[in-house]
Amino acid sequence: MPQPAPLDFVVVGLNHQTAPVEVRERVAVRPEEEGALLGHLARHADEVLLLATCNRTEVYLAGVHGDPLAAFEGAWGHALLDHLYVYRGEAAVRHLYRVTAGLDSLVIGETQIQGQVKRAWQSARERGLSGTLMNKVVQGALAAGKRVRSHTGLSDKVVSVSSAAVELAQAALGELSQRRALILGAGETAELTLTHLRAAGVQDVLVVNRTAERARALAEKLGGRACPAEELSAALPEVDVVIASSAAPHYVVTAQNVREALAGRPGRAMFLIDISVPRILDPEIASVPGAHLYNLDDLTAVVQRNMQSRRAALPQAEAIIRELGSDLSRWYLTRETQLARQAELALACD
């Protein structure tokens, strides 16, 4: 009887550990680009899942034909080899399990990634790109994420990118209750950021989004003030902290905007934290006197301080990942063996 084929599952990608934000933003995926990217990748595999977050862009492939590295680089048109990793077979399965459980995140144990994986899978299914193997692997990944969070203390009092950004502002400014803040964006991360700002005592938070209705809805929900996007420049002199968590094809706040804002508030510094990928705060802001600019990569120190209390949960979490990864490999081997036997019987009948 023919030997069962090896587990035909591959991941190729980059993340915050292999690429700085300057590289990650080059492969960030905007919603309007997703269909074309998946169409390109589908020429290299039977099943495709594209997972793109602020800290990673990864392509999961099943039924691969061709070089997955070339498929990734061809999709984005950049020479990215120095930043890419490739895992195959069970190693690729375990990687997705670790990602979904929050073990591979900048903020270890964060929970947003579970929903991001689920949405990526839904997108693949809607386009007919998730078949038997991809469905099984992703279902296993979602189960792994739930099991790690419910059976370990990894997600207890977990810090998020949003809370880390607010903590960074507190470290720079001290007590925030007398400070004014401005959030760029109205999505899930912006909502978390506003929640943490309010918890830190900030009474006055402006919410700016290019869709005014979304800004109003978020402000009303959590006690902020909606600010029309066209009034952003006028609002900047009022605020001490700007946290950007939105998507835009260009810089929303430029160095000149900040220079003019600071001229209207002499002697008062401004702290700007960009947790968007691609970044929407002009990096040149860092050269403006009185402006202090941070991005996602600057949050590492904050995250590491908050990680100490959860390190004890890591061995148990990794053991769960190994166990469930092995279960998937056994399922695949059993399935392939059965298919091989069926093929052999069919030949014998002929």
UniProtKB/Swiss-Prot annotation:
Q: Where is this site: Important for activity?
A: H95
Q: Which GO terms describe its biological process?
A: protoporphyrinogen IX biosynthetic process from glutamate
Q: What is its EC number?
A: 1.2.1.70
Broad enzyme group: oxidoreductase
Q: Which family does it belong to?
A: Belongs to the glutamyl-tRNA reductase family.
Provide the function of this protein.
Answer: Catalyzes the NADPH-dependent reduction of glutamyl-tRNA(Glu) to glutamate 1-semialdehyde (GSA).
Official protein name in the record: Glutamyl-tRNA reductase
Q: Which organism is it from?
A: Deinococcus radiodurans (strain ATCC 13939 / DSM 20539 / JCM 16871 / CCUG 27074 / LMG 4051 / NBRC 15346 / NCIMB 9279 / VKM B-1422 / R1)
